[in-house]
């Protein structure tokens, strides 16, 4: 593990986001937002917090709570308590998911290269999930630990490398959720895990979703989603794209063909086994790996 300080690692890659019309980002803050950010940091410092107080991290909590300082404080405090209780701060070295090569075939999840905005692209083939078989070799608790492990690997390794390659701060991912082959039974079996996984992402990794594509969505899925849209934040809704079976043209608008696997309509010719375990991206390229080191793996190759 690196002995460099967090400040030194942060200084090794861009901290200013790409230019945007949206305010609340390091590249576009109003005077009022700058003041709110300073007050937020000061109050957290007075509460005894010392870590994760950089501008980008704090702004994610503020954006998630519409720049309401007290709500952002409550969210931050709850997150820090969860990190301590769950062992998040040491999970990258403490947790080993040696069963992953087998689990991955029953619930394929993997990162593969980047989208046009420099985000790491995360694929999840939910339609292939076989929870009954999976629970014979792992547990839901270990699945959730692996999820958190991957979140931490993304935040500490993938995003810094992607930021160096892009030339600006990349703080979100692009997710492609493949629903091909999903059945009522498989969806029902995995709903408990999905619910817990969604809560972790929403409560403890705010503002990490850049783009979210649901492909091969069954008939009626879009209609059902429309019923929930009024209850969702408009910014969140704008990031979600529900696509049917003719998704390739839309997906290629966001992901370069050379980065999108052939199986999803791109030109990246890679086998399923390599997709599951190779973890290809800037975080494996020496040119973009910084003082944090190469992204670790939760299992031995």
From Swiss-Prot:
One of its GO terms (molecular function) is phosphatidylcholine transporter activity. PROSITE patterns: CRAL_TRIO (PS50191). It is a peripheral membrane protein. Keywords: Golgi apparatus, Membrane, Protein transport, Transport. Residues 99-272 form the CRAL-TRIO domain. InterPro entries: CRAL-TRIO_dom, CRAL-TRIO_dom_sf, CRAL/TRIO_N_dom, CRAL/TRIO_N_dom_sf, PI/PC_transfer. It holds the Pfam family CRAL_TRIO_N. Its main location: Golgi. It is found in: Golgi apparatus membrane. It comes from the Eukaryota. GO terms for cellular component: cytosol; Golgi apparatus; Golgi membrane. Transmembrane segments: none annotated. One of its GO terms (biological process) is ascospore formation. Required for transport of secretory proteins from the Golgi complex. Catalyzes the transfer of phosphatidylinositol and phosphatidylcholine between membranes in vitro. This is SEC14 cytosolic factor. It comes from Candida albicans (strain SC5314 / ATCC MYA-2876) (Yeast).
């Amino acid at each position: 593990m690196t002995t460099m300080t967090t400040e030194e690692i942060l200084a090794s890659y861009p901290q200013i986001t790409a230019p945007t019309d949206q305010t609340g980002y390091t590249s576009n803050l109003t005077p009022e937002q700058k003041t709110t950010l300073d007050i937020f940091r000061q109050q957290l410092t007075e509460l005894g917090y010392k870590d994760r107080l950089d501008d980008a991290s704090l702004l994610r909590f503020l954006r998630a709570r519409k720049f309401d300082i007290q709500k952002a404080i409550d969210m931050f405090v709850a997150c820090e308590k969860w990190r301590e209780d769950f062992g998040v701060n040491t999970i990258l070295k403490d947790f080993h998911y040696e069963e992953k090569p087998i689990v991955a075939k029953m619930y394929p999840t993997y990162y593969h290269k980047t989208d046009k905005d420099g985000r790491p692209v995360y694929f999840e083939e939910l339609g292939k999930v076989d929870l009954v078989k999976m629970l014979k070799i792992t547990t839901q608790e270990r699945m959730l630990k692996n999820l958190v492990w991957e979140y931490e690997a993304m935040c500490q390794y993938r995003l810094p490398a992607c930021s160096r390659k892009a030339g600006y701060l990349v703080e979100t991912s692009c997710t492609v959720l493949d629903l091909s082959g999903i059945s009522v039974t498989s969806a029902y079996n995995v709903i408990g895990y999905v619910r817990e996984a969604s809560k972790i992402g929403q409560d403890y990794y705010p503002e990490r979703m850049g783009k979210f594509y649901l492909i091969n969505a069954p008939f009626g899925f879009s209609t059902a989603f429309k019923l929930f849209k009024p209850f969702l934040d408009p910014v969140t809704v704008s990031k979600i794209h529900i696509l049917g079976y003719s998704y390739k043209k839309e997906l290629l608008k966001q992901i370069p063909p050379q980065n999108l696997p052939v199986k999803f309509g791109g030109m990246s010719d890679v086998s399923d086994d390599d997709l599951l375990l190779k973890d290809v991206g800037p975080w494996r390229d020496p040119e973009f790996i910084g003082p944090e080191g190469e992204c670790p793996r939760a299992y031995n190759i």
